[in-house]
Structures are given as C-alpha cells and as structure tokens.
Amino acid sequence: MNNGHLNQILLITDGCSNHGEDPLAMAAFAKEQGITVNVIGIMEENQIDPEAMKEVEGIALAGGGVHQVVYASQLSQTVQMVTKKAMTQTLQGVVNQELKQILGKNVEMEELSPEKRGEVMEVVDELGETVHLQVLVLVDTSASMAPKLPTVKEALIDLSVSLNSRIGNNEFAMCIFPGKKQEVELVLNWTPKLQSLSTLFAKLSTGGITPTGPAIREATLQFEKIRSRRGMLADDERRFDEFGM
C-alpha cells in the first residue's frame, strides 16, 4: 500500500509457466514494491494438475496475496472474492502496523478484546470502501485458455461493476501473455471502468508459450510507470503554486 493506494496484480491462468524468469521470484519482487499478487487458477472439470496448483499457491504466497483454484463456471464470484479478500488482508496488515506503533508493542488482532477488534474491523471496512484501488489484470492467453476467455471477460466486467459501488476510486489495466509480438503485451491502459473489454477480448488470439514470470515483471513495471507519472504531475502542481498560478 503506497500513499493511500492499494495495488494488486490479479493473475488468471490455467497452467504452469514454461518460459522466462521464475514467477515466484517475480511475485516476491512485486511484493517488495508494495504490490499484492493474487492468483486464480482455472482448471478443467474433473482435471486437476498438481504442478499447476502448486505454482498458483506459490506465486500468491510469494506475492503476499490470495489464491484460488476454480472451474471456469465459478470464475465470476471467485474474481470478486479474491480481490476483496486481498484488500481486507492488506488493510488489516496496515492497521496492525499502526496499532503496533501506537501501543509500542507487537499486538495481534486476536489479542484485542472483542470490542476493540470490532472497532479495528470497522476501520478496515471503511478503508476498503474509500482507498484508491489499482488492479492490473494479467490474463494467460496460451492455447488452452481459448475456450475460457469469454468467461474471463464476463468475470472481469462483473468485478468492475462490483467495485464501482465503492466510494473510493478504482483503476484497472490489463496485460496478456503471451502477446502477439512480445512475451507480454499491455492491451488496456489504466482506466476507471472495464466496459471496453467486450471489444478487446474479441480481438484476442491464443497460442504459444506461458511466460508467467515475465508477465509479473511487466505488471510491476506498469505500476512504477503510473507512480512516476503521478510524481511528475505533483511536481507540476507545486511549480504552478510557486508561481501563483
């Protein structure tokens, strides 16, 4: 969490990475930059891939996020649940740190009285409603994802509608991997709503390798870009103020 912004990568995939950097190392790097990495693994009915499940869990653990393995039919409610659960988890961590600073000692939520715990959760809930949320969605477009992409599109539109009921601002961006000409391709730059997804998904093609590690690295870079842009805007505002403009 940086300057009142909650930053999340939401990785949606159906298999193991097979190209580029270690995705767990890239997820750990993202976490160091204040970005939570959440992972949803989509499995075929009656087909569970133990290696893929292990990687899904490992990436989320390294990235400080939440993971869930689901069938495509369960995707919509899962995307919303994972995003909101990760928000609460991150905010609880922030509030816990504040408590430790105020009380001058390590205090866990479980050690508080029920009344105090309730007050803390109220603060967490309020922050969840008002904090500026940025979600970069990483969609696996390898060949096996082709029949699942329409469901992914609907799930992301539902997520946008669900989060727009919050008071706080939302921003979404989306990368696919592999891209048409690169390992990773930014197909949707930062925007408050995801209405354009229908047109976007209609143009997506599937096939090729699964460069999950490079995709997480690129997602982290996109957050750095928006931070530096925000910093430049703040500098411009200060200059205008100095000149009385």
Swiss-Prot record:
In Swiss-Prot or TrEMBL terms, this protein is called Uncharacterized protein YabS
Q: Which InterPro entries match?
A: VWF_A, vWFA_dom_sf
Q: Which PROSITE patterns does the entry link to?
A: VWFA
Q: Which Gene3D superfamilies match?
A: von Willebrand factor, type A domain
